[in-house]
Amino acid sequence: MKKFINRLLLMLMSVVVGRIAGANELEMRYQAGIEVKRDVQVKRVERKISYRAPRIEDAIALNIYVEDKISGIKPYIPGLTGLVRKAIKIAYRDGVDSAMNIFKSYDTAIQNEIRKIIEEGLKMYEKIRSEGRP
């Protein structure tokens, strides 16, 4: 019985590790520009990566930009990074003034800093949204 359970666990682990290794291999091949033609599922995954990768990189760049700029604001306000990210999305939909309503209770100097961050972040966010899906 113990041998059977061990064999079952080993089989399960090999499937999990194989899937992870397959995903990493696919990502490496994508970055190297090698086309993969193993089976339909791999092609589907590769297609998904190819149109999402530039948008993901831009989104990561936007998050890094926001975190970098927020870290310069003194005094430190917990949770401000998440609020500014939400404000950028609101600014995209309704405008910067409407997004600034979230920060009414903050000091004027901090509001001005946040407004600058939102305006710059909005440009990056518009670029991400304009690329869209093919």
From Swiss-Prot:
The domain of life is Viruses
Please identify the protein, giving its name as recorded. Uncharacterized 15.4 kDa protein
Species per Swiss-Prot/TrEMBL record: Thermoproteus tenax virus 1 (strain KRA1) (TTV1)
